[in-house]
Amino acid sequence: MSELLPMATYNLNIEPYSPTPAIDVTVPVTVRLTMAAIDPESLDDEKKPATLRLIRRNPAFDDEDDLLADSEEEEEEESEEESEPETKKPKKKAAKAESEEEDSEEEDSEGEDSDDEFEEFVLATLSPESQYQQTLDLVISPEEEVQFVVTGSYRVSLSGNYVQHPYDDEDSYDEDHEGCGENCACDDDHEGCGDDCACDDDSDYDLTPDEEDILDMEDASDVEAKIEELVEQEEANEKRKADEDEPKAAKKQKKDQKDTKKDAKKDAKKDQKDQKDAKKDAKKEKKVEFKKDLEEGPSKKKDDKPKTKILEGGVVIEDRVVGSGKAAKKGARVGMRYIGKLKNGKVFDKNTSGKPFVFKLGHGEVIKGWDIGVAGMAVGGERRIVIPAAYAYGKQALPGIPANSELTFDVKLVSLK
C-alpha cells in the first residue's frame, strides 16, 4: 500500500454538543488524524468525561437515493412521451397530484430511513483524572460527509496532517484528459488533440461545492436530533448508575456505624485498662516524704539543733536524721532524693519521687561538693549540704543558677550498693 504524503498540519477544536465538520468544504483535501487530546479545563460543574464521537452519512443510503431518483426520472420521462395531455388545466392538476404523492412518499421514506442515514462511532473517552489523550490513525477523504461531536464537560482537540493520497494524481489526470482521443498528447502542449479536446476547457470545472452538498453535509436538524439522543442516553445511564449506587451507599453507611460502635467500645475498654494500670503504678511507685523540717531548714528547737561540720573547701554538712547500716564510701553507688536551693531560698532542682538519682560516689560524676558532702551517710539518713561556688558550678551560669552561686541541698540516701 502506498504511503500517504503529509502536506500540512491539521488541527480541529470541538466544543461539547457542537457538531463540527471534519473537513472544510472550501479545502477538499484528505485528512489523517493521529491524536485526540482533552482540554483539562471543565466548561461546567459536572466534570463529565468527554466522549468523542464520529457521525458519518451512510454511503449506502446515498447510493439507494440516487438509484431511486434515477429510476423515478426514467419512469416519468417514459410516461410523458407515451401520453401528452390535451389541455393545460388537466396537466396542472396532474402535476399537483404527483407532487403531493411524491411529498407523502418522501415523508414516509424519511421516517423509515432516518435511523439508517447516519452512522455513529465512538472514537475515545477522555478525562483529566484518567486519560488526557488518545492516539488515532484515521484517514478521512473529502468525499466522506463526516462530523465530530463531543459529549461531556470538556473540549477536545484533534491533530494530524493534511495528506496527499497516492491516487489523487491519477484521478486528476483522468479528469483533465476526458474528451481526448487515444493519441492525446496533452503533455506535449496539447499537440495532436482534436477540435473537441477538453484539456483547456476549464469553464466546466468548478471547485466550489454545490449548495445541495453543503446543505446535506450540514443538515443541522438531523445532527441535533442525534446529539439529543446521545444526551438522553447518557442521562439515563447516569440515573441507572445512581439508583444502583444508592443501596451500596446505605450498606456502607450501616457498616461504618457498626465499625464506629466497635471502635468506641474498644476505646472505652482501653481507657479502663489504662486507669487500672495507672492505679497499679501509683501503688508500686515509692514516694519518699521529706520531713517538714528538712525542707524548711534546721529545727528551731534548741535541743534538736543538728550538729554542723565544715569539710574540705568550706563544704558545710548538717545531719538531720542519722541513717542505719554501713556508711557510704568512695566507689559505692548511692541513690539520692534531694531538693536544691539558691542562697535566697529559691528551688532550682529537686528529685522527691519516681526513680532516685543514682551516681558513683567519689568518681567526679557530680559536682565536687556532692562527692564530699554525701560521703559517710547511711541508708535513711537525711543531711543538709551547703556548697560554696568553687565546689559547685563556679563561674559557670546554668538555667536557674547564676554564676558564682552558693548552693544548698537537702538530701536523703535511699539506696546504697
UniProtKB/Swiss-Prot annotation:
Pfam families: FKBP_C, NPL. One of its GO terms (cellular component) is chromatin. Its EC number is 5.2.1.8. Residues 331-417 form the PPIase FKBP-type domain. InterPro entries: NPL (IPR041232), PPIase_dom_sf (IPR046357), PPIase_FKBP_dom (IPR001179), PPIase_Fpr3/Fpr4-like (IPR023566). It catalyses: [protein]-peptidylproline (omega=180) = [protein]-peptidylproline (omega=0). It is found in: Nucleus, Nucleolus. Residues 61-84, 99-120, 197-222 have a biased composition (Acidic residues). Residues 236-249, 256-307 have a biased composition (Basic and acidic residues). PPIases accelerate the folding of proteins. It catalyzes the cis-trans isomerization of proline imidic peptide bonds in oligopeptides. Belongs to the FKBP-type PPIase family. FKBP3/4 subfamily. This is FK506-binding protein 3. It comes from Eremothecium gossypii (strain ATCC 10895 / CBS 109.51 / FGSC 9923 / NRRL Y-1056) (Yeast). The gene is FPR3.
